[in-house]
Amino acid sequence: MANKAVNDFILAMNYDKKKLLTHQGESIENRFIKEGNQLPDEFVVIERKKRSLSTNTSDISVTATNDSRLYPGALLVVDETLLENNPTLLAVDRAPMTYSIDLPGLASSDSFLQVEDPSNSSVRGAVNDLLAKWHQDYGQVNNVPARMQYEKITAHSMEQLKVKFGSDFEKTGNSLDIDFNSVHSGEKQIQIVNFKQIYYTVSVDAVKNPGDVFQDTVTVEDLKQRGISAERPLVYISSVAYGRQVYLKLETTSKSDEVEAAFEALIKGVKVAPQTEWKQILDNTEVKAVILGGDPSSGARVVTGKVDMVEDLIQEGSRFTADHPGLPISYTTSFLRDNVVATFQNSTDYVETKVTAYRNGDLLLDHSGAYVAQYYITWDELSYDHQGKEVLTPKAWDRNGQDLTAHFTTSIPLKGNVRNLSVKIRECTGLAWEWWRTVYEKTDLPLVRKRTISIWGTTLYPQVEDKVEND
């Protein structure tokens, strides 16, 4: 066995993997109230609630700022820096490691390689040599489509996004310029989507004994001097996925509850019919993207535009070619002591802002009947007190109970906060035993953009129509 002393030192470590790999983000109290704002064309209700998000993942994203330390076989220290995806690399003399790559067509003898002293440069050089051989000998007959993965979330806070996409997402988030103030005020809805297009994965053979990864020159004292202990054990990067990833910000000022469904249709490439609510939402959506990998440049690329560029962005990196070599986009780690895959557990509280808009409407009355008519129209107007509780204020039309003759027409504007709308219309029959006859009576009418109630006919045969236009 290579380096028995170091092997025994690592095997003797006793630690709680879950505790080491758990990160708790923000903790907040649920002290939020509803509020309502009457705008010129609509009544907007803003409701904020405490939400919690937890994730368990072994797949860690790679960013442009940390990829030089993240190569297959790298030894990383399990501490706060690893939880923040800004890991500490253990640089010591290393024993050879065997690597494999999952590109199609490779003969068994060509699908793996050995690196004598694994480091970022030596591993990258060996992988690049193998890729060059694949392109030359196999690439012409093996067309490799990217393996597509995506995940999405409606944005409410940076802590929430860091739990969802990785603890170092803030770097990418800053490039996306996420306007959380507008989200919290209810002015915008924002969704973040992460597309991963994986071209190939490089893996290392599982470590049989912890000491096998070190040269004999490495001592237990060397590890202790670098802070390695049961409180700060080691993991090794067991695989790295190479390809391209795109972070999309979809931002709209629409207050519709169909925004998430419209964005889902966009992401999945569903054809959206014209003159639909989804089309209106997407036409009112701005897109910003941060693109990592997929071209020879190692830098991140930021582009902005409308939703019609989303499909092009995805298709742009859909296949692995020599012109689209890919970069490290994610990695997994295993504990050096026992090869158990390291699973990171992150959680946070955040404030979810839900905005509901109620459009103003009009109630049109049209009376052309050969009789005297009376209207009784009442409603409540909704508001919220300082504790966020609903307050309903009774209102009534100022011409209720008046005798009105044909031809009478009027429009009653109703604000978006109208609730419990009731309309009663009666006509004078002239009959002693039924002087007033009810022509129309409905309660709790929904507020619509335009409702026209028309009455006509004679005293004994009154007619009525209730026409709703809600485009």
From Swiss-Prot:
InterPro entries: Thiol_cytolys_C, Thiol_cytolys_C_sf, Thiol_cytolysin, Thiol_cytolysin_ab_sf, Thiol_cytolysin_sf. It holds the Pfam family Thiol_cytolysin. A motif (Conserved undecapeptide) lies at residues 427-437. Erythrocytes hemolysis is inhibited by cholesterol. It comes from the Bacteria. Changing D168A: 20% hemolytic activity, inhibits membrane insertion, forms prepores on liposomes which detach easily and rarely convert to pores. The chain crosses the membrane at residues 158-171, 178-187, 256-265, 273-285. Elongated monomers align along their lengths, indicating intersubunit contacts and suggesting the prepore structure. Modeling based on cryo-EM shows a homooligomeric pore complex containing 38-44 subunits; when inserted in the host membrane. The size of isolated pores is detergent-dependent; in amphipol A8-35 homogenous rings form with 42 subunits. This is Pneumolysin. The gene is ply.
